[in-house]
Amino acid sequence: MMTLASDFGSPYPAAMRGVICARTDARIVDVTHEFPRQDVRAAAFWLREVLPYFPPATHCVVVDPGVGTDRAAVVVEAGDHCLVAPDNGVVVPVARRLADATGDHEDDETEGFDVWEYEYADSEMASSTFHGRDLFAPAAAAVHDADAPGDLERCVRTDEWVDLRFPDPEIEEGRAVGEILVVDDFGNAVTNVPGEVVGGLDPVRVDGEEVPVRAAYAELDAGDRLVTVGSHGNVELAVNRSRGDRAFGVTVGDRVVLDW
């Protein structure tokens, strides 16, 4: 199995699928091609939440603001999964989670997955603006058909790669200071505050204003604001049947203070 994920929209992913299908008979599943454009951190968050639900697969991810520059291409092996992506950190959080799931993640947070640089020459690229088609799709096909990334001549083991970590919240007695990590398509503003922080609390204050804590959006009337815990396990600022980001006046990267 192979998955594809990008910020390309349409129809660019079709060209990637064509390149892959010409090289391998892998079953292809499109995760999404609607990541926020050039937003590596948002893509990394959602990949971390989605890809662990797949059986062993090769995952081709292209969110690549550095396309056409000297940024490297990497292949990351985590558990029974291989991730092919630009070296900008986009697949590092999910690699850590996949390593956790297989019990391979040890004391050093970088242990449990292996990274190879996938070597290529600029002269091989038909376009300097579409490495998804010219670089990552062929690389993913080759990785899919190989027994292991290390069996490919183009794969060179490396300990130097771009890391990406989400910020930790500041939690103390009666107070949590977090950050908006992403806003989903419903307008739910997802924080980095773990859900257990609000367990048993109702209400809490969000930036000084009291807001009810609920397990489900529909426990309140349409248009009412709430704090809830999303399926990802983090605290969300939400509105029943409307957009929490607008109602709370927040966007990605904003600081949020919860106290009780």
List the model feature ranges, each with a label.
Residues 1-2, 12-16, 98-110, 146-154, ...:
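Haloarchaeal acidic low-complexity proteome signature biased toward cell-envelope/secretome components but also
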Residues 25, 41-42, 55-56, 60-117, ...:
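Active-site histidine-anchored catalytic micro-motif
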Residues 121-192, 197:
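Anionic-ligand-binding alpha/beta catalytic cores of soluble enzymes and soluble regulatory domains
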Residues 11, 15, 38, 42-45, ...:
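Conserved active-site and cofactor/substrate-binding residues in soluble primary-metabolism enzymes
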Residues 1-73:
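N-terminal glycine-/serine-/threonine-rich phosphate-binding loop
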Residues 190-249:
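A conserved acidic, glycine/proline-rich C-terminal tail/linker
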